[in-house]
């Protein structure tokens, strides 16, 4: 009888353990599905700790080798014959002096004296009334946040596109930070907030396509920045102009411990010329919910023969504005779409998009409100 009781106790414990682990795993899977962005951040933080530990071990090993090498000093300033010192020396970048004289007939330089580098990023909430009052003193800002320098010819005319839904507390912080920085960089710019209405899952990529089309109707732009509203640059030398290749500006996010999550990461803030964006047929429209659209954009860029450039060193650091909203649910169909990126590139994008926007021009930005639905971007079989 006592043996039977012990067996029952063991059986009950096993059952309770099974129920506990089943409940725990189910809760974890549900959390990953409904809040994939947060779950992904936590996962990468754990991975980043491992990466940092391995890098520290490598650094210690390298310092020991330098110390024991007769031809090397501890700080690495003297190198063994034939060694490539470019791995150790950082090339300095010269910026123009304070007394530099601008010319309204010449292009604005890219390395201006007012670009100091590190920015003190303040993510404290501020009201739109305060922001409007602050920038009302700048009479050069036209409706829609359109600004251009007067002391030189802007090297780039930049349309900043911001996909948006229910982040009203972020917009004032964003403008408070970005407007002065872009003015320092002597770029011509304006802001377009593309707001998704309705009940469909958030479609960041389709919003960018809508914003691009409307911005092209509004003015003559040659550079487009695709910018998440909760990402703030920490360095004003991160120049928001475009180049011969597409640019990934947000290479080091604080929420990822300032480490690039993976080589093909193209999220947060990116920039393409108008010609480049049209050549790749824009973003895909088929990604509803969280994840995948940036990876598809990376594929499109490479299929079109481009490479992606990134800022050097700490220039690509960004701070994320904290938010209290539940993130979008995970888009489980993204893996199939990514598998057929090449086949879909020229049948899903700028060329198959239908929409009806409502446009409101604010003092600091143009608001493009649109109710997105899958039938607005029909896709042929591939």
UniProtKB/Swiss-Prot annotation:
Membrane topology of this protein: Single-pass type II membrane protein
Gene3D superfamilies: Spore Coat Polysaccharide Biosynthesis Protein SpsA, Chain A (3.90.550.10)
Residues binding Mn(2+): 230, 323
Tissue specificity: High expression in brain and adrenal gland, lower in liver, lung, colon and peripheral white blood cells.
Keywords: Calcium, Disulfide bond, Glycoprotein, Glycosyltransferase, Golgi apparatus, Lipid biosynthesis, Lipid metabolism, Magnesium, Manganese, Membrane, Metal-binding, Signal-anchor, Sphingolipid metabolism, Transferase, Transmembrane, Transmembrane helix
Binding residue positions for UDP-alpha-D-galactose: 163-167, 202-204, 229-230, 258, 290, 323-324
Entry GO CC: Golgi apparatus; Golgi cisterna membrane; Golgi membrane
Disulfide partners: 108-152, 223-242
Glycosylation sites: 71, 75, 83-84, 99, 122, 307, 367
Residues reported in the UniProt entry to bind N-acetyl-D-glucosamine: 292-295, 334
Pfam families (alphabetical): Glyco_transf_7C (PF02709), Glyco_transf_7N (PF13733)
EC numbers for this chain: 2.4.1.-, 2.4.1.274
Pathway(s) this gene product operates in, as recorded in its UniProt entry: Protein modification; protein glycosylation; Sphingolipid metabolism
Compartments reported by the entry: Golgi apparatus, Golgi stack membrane
GO molecular function, one term: metal ion binding
Lumenal side: 36-382
Cytoplasmic side: 1-14
Membrane spanning stretches: 15-35
Cofactor needs: Mn(2+); Mg(2+)
Listed InterPro entries: Galactosyl_T, Galactosyl_T_C, Galactosyl_T_N, Nucleotide-diphossugar_trans
Record's protein name: Beta-1,4-galactosyltransferase 6
Organism of this sequence: Homo sapiens (Human)
Gene this chain is encoded by: B4GALT6
